[in-house]
Amino acid sequence: MSAVTPCADGLILRLYIQPKASRDSIVGLHGDEVKVAITAPPVDGQANSHLVKFLGKQFRVAKSQVVIEKGELGRHKQVKIIHPQQIPPEIAALTD
């Protein structure tokens, strides 16, 4: 499975998360996953909620349309974006 997989109602992203980074950003490819740096610490679900909010802004969707399918407690996550309104250029480059 690749880092970005189109599905019937959106995109499935395989992510590697770097918490406590200096800024929020989509870094690029990290092995067979997309590396995402977020500023939130990995404590009490703060990193997950921050990740959902960040991805919602990047894809221009509501937070409820960003679903963490796998990896709730780890750095390696599988996230589904339902009906993205826009694709960030870092992700668009990986779908070609």
Curated annotation (Swiss-Prot):
It comes from the Bacteria. Gene3D superfamilies: YggU-like. Pfam families: DUF167 (PF02594). InterPro entries: DUF167 (IPR003746), YggU-like_sf (IPR036591). One of its GO terms (cellular component) is cytoplasm. Belongs to the UPF0235 family. This is UPF0235 protein CKO_04329. It comes from Citrobacter koseri (strain ATCC BAA-895 / CDC 4225-83 / SGSC4696).
